[in-house]
């Protein structure tokens, strides 16, 4: 697994040991980052990487010009991997790594421009996540499409093998 583009292009990334995480493939990571770039959601953005695993998705966006990234992960081995990957890519200064449950962190965390959500495939509480996620734009990786709940609109949806990537934008509320 490698960083696909940007300042850390070609740098090797490690995956956490065991089967606790499911790293996003280089191809899918590149497609997500390119799509976000075309929507103006990368350069200068503050990224939230939930269920961060190896941190590869947030690192990809940092490499492509995101201002900062917060990585939220519960597994200790995955957190060690994220920290190592940030050191390997030279992106530590633009990063915060938090050990917490994603939903718990969202209820108390700061505001971000885009949230990257790659929970375990068994996760099915998208309405609860969308109710508390502190970002107006969400990229969800799941085994099936994520439905836009009240207050959210579907921007784009694409299937990559067994992974469905859903882009959602928070809708403006009328006064």
Please report, for each region that a protein language model flagged, where it lies by residue:
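Class I S-adenosyl-L-methionine-dependent methyltransferase catalytic core
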Residues: 1-175
């Amino acid at each position: 697994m490698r960083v696909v583009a940007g300042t850390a292009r070609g740098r090797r990334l490690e995956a956490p040991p065991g089967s606790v995480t499911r790293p996003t493939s280089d191809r899918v990571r590149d497609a997500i980052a390119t799509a976000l770039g075309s929507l103006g959601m990368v350069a200068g953005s503050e990224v939230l990487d939930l269920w961060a695993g190896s941190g590869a998705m947030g690192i990809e966006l940092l490499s492509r010009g995101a201002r900062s990234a917060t990585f939220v992960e519960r597994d200790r081995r995955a957190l060690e991997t994220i920290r190592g990957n940030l050191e390997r890519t030279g992106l530590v200064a633009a990063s915060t790594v938090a050990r917490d449950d994603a939903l718990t962190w969202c209820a108390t965390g700061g505001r971000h421009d885009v949230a990257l959500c790659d929970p375990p495939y068994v996760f099915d509480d998208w309405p609860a996540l969308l109710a508390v996620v502190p970002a107006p734009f969400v990229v969800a990786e799941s085994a099936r499409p994520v439905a836009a709940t009240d207050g959210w609109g579907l921007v784009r949806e694409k299937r990559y093998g067994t992974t469905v990537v859903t882009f959602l934008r928070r809708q403006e509320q009328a006064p």
